[in-house]
Swiss-Prot record:
It comes from Clostridium beijerinckii (strain ATCC 51743 / NCIMB 8052) (Clostridium acetobutylicum). One of its GO terms (biological process) is nucleobase-containing small molecule interconversion. The active site is at E121 (proton donor/acceptor). NCBIfam families: dCTP_deam. The lineage of its organism: Bacteria, Bacillati, Bacillota, Clostridia, Eubacteriales. It is an enzyme of class 3 (hydrolase). This is dCTP deaminase, dUMP-forming. DCTP binds at R93, S94, S95, T96, G97, R98, D111, T119, L120, E121, Q138, Y151. Belongs to the dCTP deaminase family. One of its GO terms (molecular function) is dCTP deaminase (dUMP-forming) activity. Bifunctional enzyme that catalyzes both the deamination of dCTP to dUTP and the hydrolysis of dUTP to dUMP without releasing the toxic dUTP intermediate. Pathway: Pyrimidine metabolism; dUMP biosynthesis; dUMP from dCTP: step 1/1. The record marks G108, F109 as: Important for bifunctional activity.
Length: 173
């Protein structure tokens, strides 16, 4: 079952951490998250799953940055989130989707116990200008039933910024 906005609010500071938190960003069953002012792009046209892929940082100026179609941009939320009782999920806002802007390519599902900033896999279908601090996506929470272990040792846990793919670590096992 998805938590209502009122239930999210009741759990803030205990089972759900969102920092910084602004009550005005609560929706009927989600909370809006905003875009940080930096993006990462991969430097190479061909990416290799088995090796770290070099990236470069792009700053989003206050007057906006024009994104190009066919290019993957990695961003992150301004908000740090943590959950100990609910499964977090991330979705783009309908307003961004209607502009042809995808906020996550495949990674909208979080694990119970995840703590960190959300890395956004941003892709657009036509050129679009984006701005820092825009409310770009929303987080919502599911109940979990049955026994579970908290996510605590994943490669993206407690991240401090934008996380490029660390899939190469899966090959090191």
């Amino acid at each position: 079952m998805i938590l209502s906005g009122k239930e999210i609010l009741k759990n803030i500071g205990s089972n759900i951490i969102i920092e910084p938190f602004d009550e005005k960003k609560i929706n009927p069953n989600s909370y809006n998250l905003s875009l940080h002012n930096e993006l990462l792009v991969y430097e190479n046209d061909i990416l290799d799953m088995k090796t770290p892929n070099p990236t470069k940082v792009i700053k989003i100026p206050e007057d906006g940055l024009l994104l190009e179609p066919g290019k993957l941009y990695l961003g992150r939320t301004n908000e740090f989130t943590s959950t100990s009782k609910y499964v977090p999920m991330l979705e783009g806002r309908s307003s961004t989707g209607r502009l042809g802007l995808f906020i996550h390519v495949t990674a909208g599902f979080g694990d119970i116990g995840f703590s960190g900033y959300w890395t956004l896999e941003i892709f657009c279908v036509q050129p679009i200008k984006v701005y820092p601090n825009v409310e770009i996506c929303q987080i919502y929470y599911h109940d979990i039933h049955g026994e579970y272990d908290l996510y605590s040792s994943g490669k993206y846990q407690n991240n401090k910024g934008i996380q490029p793919s660390l899939m190469y670590k899966d090959f090191e096992k």
